[in-house]
Amino acid sequence: PIRVNQDKTKTHQFMSTFTIDQSDGSLHFLFYDRSTAKQPNETQVVWVKSQDGGKRFEQQCISTKPFVPTAKIFFGDYISIAAVKGHIVPVWVRLDQGRASLWTANLNLK
């Protein structure tokens, strides 16, 4: 196994998804992350990329701010990422005050 994330803590990273950009072979991972949490269950969304076949990984938090999910609303399966010709499109759900919202970002390597 190869470690993808940069986290040295014992916090949770979960519901990971990944894709390979067929145009250049770059690897792209997306997951929920609690490594920077200031309160219990505070969650961010992290994108990790490798442009050298998995020898090195670069990590970036892409959520605008952390959120704290509630046990009453399931949100985890609704996360995905696509990559085509250096254009990366992650999609995820976050919860704010018990309301789910769908988010995306426009990430470009070119």
Model-derived regions: residue spans:
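Extracellular, repeat-based ectodomains that mediate carbohydrate processing or recognition
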Residues: 1-110
